[in-house]
């Protein structure tokens, strides 16, 4: 099965400016992500960036680069520009890997592409089980709820489903008994290229603006998303300087 990976790489991160070029074990972070994507078996890997320095570095280590606008409001808008510019066929499977995931397991990159191919949907993703109560109540950990067949019912930063009997008068998070129903969404997506172009034609919705979760636009417009449990739990991504140091320590041991 053929699929294409697109890696958005913004230089102007608010919390860690220039992070695509941050050195990790002698390589820029974006190169680590690129190499993981290649290891997944993708037929094509494209780095999408709005920065000439990132583009030059990526070309030097052999990556295909697509320059994109600095004015996109979301990562999906950046993907749509790449799909249009490179005339990628509508039925091609596109996997979106964030440029700040240098430890992403190649096996789950392939898995999300296979997930999309197996089901009659235009979008697929992955999740992992939540085993920690603090993670469950952390709004930065996005929860996902599915039906019995893995089709998404909703994504939220809130606790879903809400255990009324246990949470109504909760005094100590550490005493929470977690059910198997609690899943954390992993921010890796597979789409058909034509669907990405459709997505950006839809207006932003109140749901996505409230939760700050752009995937809710898909559900609002009546499309289905299929989610599987990830075969491997991905390690930390890089959002802050502290995250960067953690990743450096992990890769220094390899």
UniProtKB/Swiss-Prot annotation:
GO cellular component terms listed in the entry, alphabetical order: cytosol
Keywords for the protein's UniProt record, in alphabetical order: Cytoplasm, Lipopolysaccharide biosynthesis, Nucleotidyltransferase, Transferase
SUPFAM superfamilies per the UniProt record, alphabetical: Nucleotide-diphospho-sugar transferases (SSF53448)
A GO term, aspect molecular function: 3-deoxy-manno-octulosonate cytidylyltransferase activity
Catalytic activity as recorded in UniProt: 3-deoxy-alpha-D-manno-oct-2-ulosonate + CTP = CMP-3-deoxy-beta-D-manno-octulosonate + diphosphate
EC number: 2.7.7.38
Subcellular location: Cytoplasm
InterPro entries from the UniProt entry: Cytidylyl_trans, KdsB, Nucleotide-diphossugar_trans
GO BP field: CMP-keto-3-deoxy-D-manno-octulosonic acid biosynthetic process; lipopolysaccharide biosynthetic process
Major site of localization recorded for this protein: cytoplasm
Domain of life: Bacteria
Metabolic or biological pathway: Nucleotide-sugar biosynthesis; CMP-3-deoxy-D-manno-octulosonate biosynthesis; CMP-3-deoxy-D-manno-octulosonate from 3-deoxy-D-manno-octulosonate and CTP: step 1/1; Bacterial outer membrane biogenesis; lipopolysaccharide biosynthesis
Stored NCBIfam families: kdsB, PRK05450.1-3, PRK05450.1-5, PRK13368.1
Record function comment: Activates KDO (a required 8-carbon sugar) for incorporation into bacterial lipopolysaccharide in Gram-negative bacteria.
Family that this chain belongs to: Belongs to the KdsB family.
Record's protein name: 3-deoxy-manno-octulosonate cytidylyltransferase
Annotated organism of origin: Haemophilus influenzae (strain PittEE)
Gene label: kdsB
């Amino acid at each position: 099965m053929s699929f294409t990976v697109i890696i958005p790489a913004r230089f102007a991160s608010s919390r860690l400016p220039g992070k695509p070029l941050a050195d990790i074990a002698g390589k820029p972070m974006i190169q680590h992500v690129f190499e993981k994507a290649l290891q997944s078996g993708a037929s094509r890997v494209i780095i999408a960036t709005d920065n000439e320095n990132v583009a030059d570095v990526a070309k030097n280590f052999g990556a295909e680069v697509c320059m994109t606008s600095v004015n996109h409001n979301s990562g999906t808008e950046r993907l749509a520009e790449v799909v249009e510019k490179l005339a990628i066929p509508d039925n091609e499977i596109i996997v979106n890997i964030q440029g700040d995931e240098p430890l992403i397991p190649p096996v789950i990159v392939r898995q999300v592409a296979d997930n999309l191919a197996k089901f009659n949907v235009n979008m697929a993703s992955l999740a992992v089980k939540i085993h920690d109560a603090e993670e469950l109540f952390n709004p930065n950990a996005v929860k996902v709820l599915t039906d019995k067949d893995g089709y998404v019912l909703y994504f939220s930063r809130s606790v879903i489903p809400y255990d009324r009997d246990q949470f109504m008068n909760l005094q100590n998070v550490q005493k929470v008994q977690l059910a198997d129903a609690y899943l954390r969404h992993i921010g890796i997506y597979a789409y058909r290229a034509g669907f990405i172009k459709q997505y950006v034609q839809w207006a932003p919705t109140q749901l996505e603006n409230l939760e700050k979760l752009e995937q809710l636009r898909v559900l609002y417009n009546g499309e289905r998303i299929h989610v599987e449990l990830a075969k491997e739990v991905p390690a930390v991504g890089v959002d802050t300087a502290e995250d960067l140091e953690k990743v450096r320590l992990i890769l220094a041991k390899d």
